[in-house]
UniProtKB/Swiss-Prot annotation:
This is Cobalt transport protein CbiM. One of its GO terms (cellular component) is ATP-binding cassette (ABC) transporter complex. The gene is cbiM. Forms an energy-coupling factor (ECF) transporter complex composed of an ATP-binding protein (A component, CbiO), a transmembrane protein (T component, CbiQ) and 2 possible substrate-capture proteins (S components, CbiM and CbiN) of unknown stoichimetry. Part of the energy-coupling factor (ECF) transporter complex CbiMNOQ involved in cobalt import. GO terms for biological process: cobalamin biosynthetic process.
Amino acid sequence: MKLGESMKKNATLSVKIIAFLGVLIFTVMPVANAMHIMEGYLSPKWCIIWGILVLPFLIKGSLNVKKVVSDDQRIKLLFAMAGAFIFILSALKLPSFTGTSSHPTGIGLSTILFGPAITTVLGVIVLLFQALLLAHGGISTLGANSFAMAVMGPLMAYGVYKILQKIKIPQNINIFFSATVGDLFTYCITAIQLGIDHPLEYDGIFASIERYLGVFAITQIPIAIAEGILTVLIFNVIAKYSSKELGKLGILNNSEEAEL
């Protein structure tokens, strides 16, 4: 009975969080085009290169999913919720004063729960569905968008998380900085991708990258901070109801579980 009640609580928690985020997506989504790189904006050469670079991480992540997720139904619920978190946050389209739009990435939560490789799998799936169902991003640019948001963003978030964990920074502060920096780094990679493929005629690649970084920074810095705060809030809710599962994933130790 305890197992059934626990699973029911986890399922209810997942539904509540996803419903809350769903309200956000439907109230904000009608604005502009989001800043996944759109269909046809990159040259075929770079589309192929970025796609090839994603493949090793995707293969590694697929193998990790089988090891981590397959044995425990409650961890499967966390896996599904982490994917929904990425889908909904990265589909939010927030207008920018620069004439573009920006969005959160949502990759911090999954990276902390499951690591960067599994987050790559979730990120690629999310980007594929967004391209097919929401015309958000594109099929030809799937590799580039995946490399930025599903590979490099999670790797940076994970690196920050482990470094801050090693020097014993409090968990909430650690999660905030990990999610925030992971979001910002995703946009740095996107700026590099755009700058390489669209160098300025006279000033070259580096000036183009600098221009894209300047365009993104105006809105992406506050968005990244907001994402960091939201990630902390969602993680604390998960920790309250699923501390045993977080312990199995190696995120909480016994003393941290007792505090919750």
